């Protein structure tokens, strides 16, 4: 039995929109679905509500069937630390309220939540069912919030705080292929901030291709929305 191949891009804003679009076109040609991780704020000084081009781009992608996943409130709010990695339930609840309200005003309402860098505190996981989320995704795996079911499948990342050095990329390519050969679900993600480096992009596509060739079935995270 084959697992899924889940590909995603994060850190999508004015500086990375063009590069994100280029990668999407390449993966679309290979019929690889890609989920987009989006947030209302990035780095404290970029705001989706004030960026008409990125807003329009995301709406076009969603209208075309692309899955958008809420990726926090402000990715850099705690400097180098991931936003939802250490929050208690009260703080997580406040940030989720802010993020969901602001995204709803812009016309986006996602059923899936993935914290920045995929790092999710127990307090965050505790309060997510209070919102309209059906699925949450962390470094460890995929949580079905209504049933409580958990699918253990670690994320393999280029960037997003995990690095994108050549040795790291080689390890990710091998890990993706091995995992697919075992019939496991393979999760591959890349930060939009790393898409300027053509070698990084090439190796990311190689990891996707190796996993698909080894039997992982391309899908987006929405496949878990039907398993409630």
Language model: regions and residue ranges:
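C-terminal domain-boundary segment and adjacent tail
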Residues: 1, 34-35, 60, 190-228
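Active-site beta->alpha N-cap acidic-glycine motif
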Residues: 1-64, 201
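Glycan-processing catalytic domains of CAZymes
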Residues: 8, 19, 69-71, 132-136, ...
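Acidic-and-aromatic substrate-binding clefts and catalytic sites of carbohydrate-active enzymes
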Residues: 11-19, 39-54, 114-123, 161-169, ...
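Alpha-helical scaffolding within the catalytic cores
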Residues: 17-23, 49-61, 138-148, 164-178
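Metal-dependent polysaccharide deacetylase catalytic core of the NodB/CE4 family, i.e.
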Residues: 33, 37-123, 185-192
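Catalytic domains of cell-wall/extracellular-matrix polysaccharide-remodeling enzymes
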Residues: 87-158, 196-202
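A conserved mid-domain beta-alpha-beta active-site/ligand-binding segment of alpha/beta enzyme cores
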Residues: 149-199
């Amino acid at each position: 039995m084959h697992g899924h191949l889940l590909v995603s891009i994060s850190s999508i804003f004015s500086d990375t929109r063009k590069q994100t679009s280029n990668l999407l076109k390449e993966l679309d040609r290979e019929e690889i679905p890609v989920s987009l991780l989006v947030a209302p704020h990035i780095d404290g000084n970029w705001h989706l509500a004030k960026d008409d081009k990125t807003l329009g781009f995301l709406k076009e992608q969603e209208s075309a069937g692309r899955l958008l996943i809420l990726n926090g409130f402000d990715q850099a709010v705690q400097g180098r630390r991931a936003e939802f990695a250490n929050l208690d339930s009260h703080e997580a609840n406040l940030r989720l309220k802010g993020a969901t309200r602001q995204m709803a005003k812009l016309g986006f309402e996602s059923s899936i939540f993935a914290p920045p860098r995929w790092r999710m505190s127990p307090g965050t996981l505790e309060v997510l069912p209070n919102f309209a989320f059906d699925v949450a995704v962390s470094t460890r795996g995929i949580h079905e919030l209504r049933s409580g079911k958990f699918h253990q499948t670690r994320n393999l990342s280029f960037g997003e705080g995990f690095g994108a050095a050549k040795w790291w990329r080689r390890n990710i390519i091998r890990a993706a292929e091995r995992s697919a050969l075992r019939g496991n679900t393979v999760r591959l993600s890349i930060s939009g901030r790393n898409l300027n480096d053509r070698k990084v992009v090439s190796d990311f596509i190689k990891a996707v291709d190796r996993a698909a060739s080894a039997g992982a079935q391309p899908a987006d995270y929405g496949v878990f929305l039907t398993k409630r």
